[in-house]
């Protein structure tokens, strides 16, 4: 993911949490903040130490990033997204992560209909 497509700073995370809305399932919570005039979406990841050791946390983050890279064309731009991984995400395969993120993205209405890459 390109640098300008990432949310890194604490104040940016806080703004998404405070001003955006959230949608969740058992494995992930997605906070969404619409941003006018921004041509692309930005993603911030939060994986707590409760999930596991550094290797596990980094693996979960890699899987989430891969999902967003694969579905870049289907995801609505002009928004900031913060994805929080919950404990069950640590033991999931990529196919399970993809299904779970697809589900929560559909609930949040951030994926444009009929544009699904690689099922």
Curated annotation (Swiss-Prot):
Keyword annotations: Endonuclease, Hydrolase, Nuclease, RNA-binding, tRNA processing
Function text: RNaseP catalyzes the removal of the 5'-leader sequence from pre-tRNA to produce the mature 5'-terminus. It can also cleave other RNA substrates such as 4.5S RNA. The protein component plays an auxiliary but essential role in vivo by binding to the 5'-leader sequence and broadening the substrate specificity of the ribozyme.
Biological processes, Gene Ontology terms: tRNA 5'-leader removal
PROSITE patterns the record matches: RIBONUCLEASE_P
Pfam families tied to this protein: Ribonuclease_P
The enzyme's E.C. designation: 3.1.26.5
Gene3D superfamilies on file: 3.30.230.10
Protein name: Ribonuclease P protein component
